[in-house]
Amino acid sequence: MDRIAALNDILTQNPNDTFARYGLAMEYSKQGDLDRSLAEFSILLKANPDYTPGCFMAAQTLARADRIADAKTMLTDGIASARRTGNLHAQSEMEAMLAELG
C-alpha cells in the first residue's frame, strides 16, 4: 500500500487526525499535486488553526504555486499562531520566509 492510500485509510477512521492529514498534504506536495496538497492543508488548518507546521508548509506550497499574496497571508496567520502558542522557532522561520517573499 502506498503512503497516500495508507494515510487515507487512517483519515477514513479519524478525519481529524492531525498528523495523517499533514502527511497527506505533504505527500501530495511531494508529488507536485499542489491543488490537492493545499486542499488537505485547508482541511487541516480548519480543524487545527494553531498547527504551525501546517501553516508554514501551506505557505511554502502556496509560494510554489505562485500564489505569493496567499502565501504571505498564510505566513501572517501562522506567525500570529506561533506567538499564541509560544513556538518561537516556527515564528522565526515564518518571519524569515515572509521577509524573503517581500
Task: Set out the residue ranges of the language-model regions.
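Residue at a conserved register position within TPR or TPR-like alpha-solenoid repeats
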Residues: 28, 62, 95-98, 102
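Canonical positions in the second alpha-helix
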Residues: 9-10, 43-44, 78
